[in-house]
Amino acid sequence: MAQGSPATVAACAFCGARRTRSGMVLSTSAADGYLDDEAQFETALRLLPAADQAAVRRRRAGRAVVLASRLLRTLGCAVHTGCAPALLAFDYSRAGKPYLRSRPAPAFSVSRSDCIAVIYVREGGAVGADLASVAECLSWAPDEILQLHDVFSAAELGRLRAAAPGRARAELFAYYWSLKEAYGKFRGTGLAGDLRLADMGELDPLRRGELRTLRRTLQGKHVCLSSRWHDAGHVLSLCEAREPSPTEEICLHKVPMEEVVRLCRPSLGMEKCHVR
């Protein structure tokens, strides 16, 4: 991993490649089988603080992806700050949004969908990230999406209604949903409040290989939302207040679960950080 201050070095903190975007996205999958091994699961779990271990154990379903998301949160912040993973201290706002108590403290946002976890981390200002699943939408009744009047504006529902039922509508829904939830995380409220106020308007489907940036004024605040396909079944959206340049790409690294665990071990040589 490349080290150095992400505020002054125009290189990805994870791979060292030059970049135009100041943040990075890491993702991992709990479906690769690594955490299916009980011994490996327990070894990975012990890398978390006791409170986080207890939170994972309380889960009746989806424990592996919850563990993956907590470890990825640690790894993303450790790589970005240069702090040793074991020295990072996290807390939660009243609304449940996690933040880093250690200093330096970048902005970050974590999302998980199906068996995949992602983190977006960068310097300066609030951020929101969301990963939305197409398969989850396909499991619903054909017209169930069109009944979500408390989620979508009239313009958004009209666009969803015009999409062909099935895969096409599910993909457009995933795009809209990822935008709304990324915006909610950016605000620190998640899905609380009137989601219709996060009106994205009439959108075309997100194309494969496309990086699309929207500029919106939502609830009196100017925001930029960037979206791309993470894989064939998930849309990734990021929300922030900054204005991206036309050439900026999302620096996305898909990290195998075994590598996430290895990099979160105490032996990882990074600098110390300060905790409030």
Curated annotation (Swiss-Prot):
Pfam families: ACPS (PF01648)
Signal peptide: none
Gene3D superfamilies assigned to the protein according to its UniProt record, in alphabetical order: 4'-phosphopantetheinyl transferase domain
Cellular component GO terms held in the UniProt record: cytosol
Keywords: Transferase
Reactions catalysed: apo-[ACP] + CoA = holo-[ACP] + adenosine 3',5'-bisphosphate + H(+)
GO molecular function: holo-[acyl-carrier-protein] synthase activity; magnesium ion binding
SUPFAM superfamilies the record matches: 4'-phosphopantetheinyl transferase
E.C. number: 2.7.8.7
Keyword Transferase in record: yes
GO biological process: lysine biosynthetic process via aminoadipic acid
Function: Catalyzes the transfer of a 4'-phosphopantetheine moiety from coenzyme A to a serine residue of acceptor proteins, such as alpha-aminoadipate reductase. Necessary for alpha-aminoadipate reductase activity.
Family the UniProt entry places it in: Belongs to the P-Pant transferase superfamily. AcpS family.
Protein name: L-aminoadipate-semialdehyde dehydrogenase-phosphopantetheinyl transferase
Origin species: Eremothecium gossypii (strain ATCC 10895 / CBS 109.51 / FGSC 9923 / NRRL Y-1056) (Yeast)
